Amino acid sequence: MANEALGPLFHNALIPQFVAARKKLNISQLEMDEILGVAKGLVSKWECGIRKPSGWLFCCWADALNMTIQLQPKVQNNDSQPRS
């Protein structure tokens, strides 16, 4: 899968969960910047889709929100298999 295809998945499926968790914990974006030790305004850029966090910062962000990241195998679609 090309990196371009991951953008909408990342922003539409994952980021709203991070935003909801941050708001539930009553943490501002600027406070989250400080917790993570990142530049002022970076969490805002992640949440708006302007920038994407590195894998490491993504894991740190989840941890700061008392969340875990779980990987699951892709569901195979029979239509995508080559036909002979």
Functional labels for PLM-detected ranges:
Residues E47, L57, L65:
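DNA major-groove recognition helix of helix-turn-helix
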Residues I15, V19, S44-K45, S54:
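Key DNA-contacting residues within the recognition helix of helix-turn-helix
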Residues A2-K24:
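A short, Lys/Arg-rich alpha-helix, primarily the initiator
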Residues R22, D33, A62:
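The alpha-helix within a helix-turn-helix
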